[in-house]
Amino acid sequence: MSVINFFPNQLFKRSFVVFAFIGLLASVLCACSPQLDWRTVTSNQAQYTALFPAKPEHLERNLVYQDQDILQVLDAVKIDDAIFSISTIELKKDQASLEDGILESSKNALSQQTDLVKDASVIREANYQTADHQRFAVKDYYFEVKMPNHSQFMRSRWIVRHTPAGEVFIYQVSVLLQNVKSGNVEQMLSQEQYATFFEEFHPL
C-alpha cells in the first residue's frame, strides 16, 4: 500500500474543502474495474474497519491548525467515476480541545463554496455501529456541485471517536460521484453499493 505525500501546508486553509481534496485524488488514483471487489480493511493507524470495493490507496498530509501539527490520512478507492474515501484526523490528548473547531470547519467548508455548491440542503438522520456493536446517531450530508456540462454528487458523514487515553479521531466517510449527467443526489447515493460503504464503516 503506497503512501503519497503531495499536499503542501499552504493548502491548509482549504484543507477541509472536500471536493478539492478528493478531486485532487482523482488525478492520482487509477480507476479500477467496474466489478466491485469488496474486502474488509482494518486500519490500525486510524483505528477503524471498513468495507472497500477494492484495495484502497493510502495518502497522508501534515497540517498546521492553531499552531498544532496534525496528521490527516486518507484511504480511498476510485471505481469508474466514483471515489470511496475515509479521511481521518487524529488529535492527541493535548489537542482534544481542537475537536469542535475542526469539525465546524469541515462541515461548513462545502456550504461556504457558494460559487460551486448549488444544492447542499439535504441532511438525513442515520446511524453507525462501532466494532463492538454499539450504535450511535449520525447525520448524512448530500451535496451537488454544478459544472458546465455535468454535476458532481457527494454524500458525507462525520464520526468522532474518543479513546480511553484521551485521543480524538475525526472520521469523514464520503462517496463522490463525478460526471453525473442527471439524477437525484440522495436517491443515487442511497443505492446499495454506496449505502454498503457507509454501513460497514466501524470505529474500533
Residue ranges and their predicted role:
Residues 73-96, 114-118, 126-204:
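Short, well-structured beta-strand
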Residues 62-71, 99:
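Short acidic, Gly/Pro-enriched loop/turn segments at secondary-structure junctions
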Residues 2-21:
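Bacterial N-terminal signal peptides that target proteins for export
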Residues 33-35:
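Bacterial signal peptide processing site
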Residues 40-62:
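Post-signal peptide N-terminal segment of mature Sec-exported envelope proteins
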Residues 28-31:
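C-terminal motif of bacterial Sec signal peptides marking the signal peptidase cleavage site
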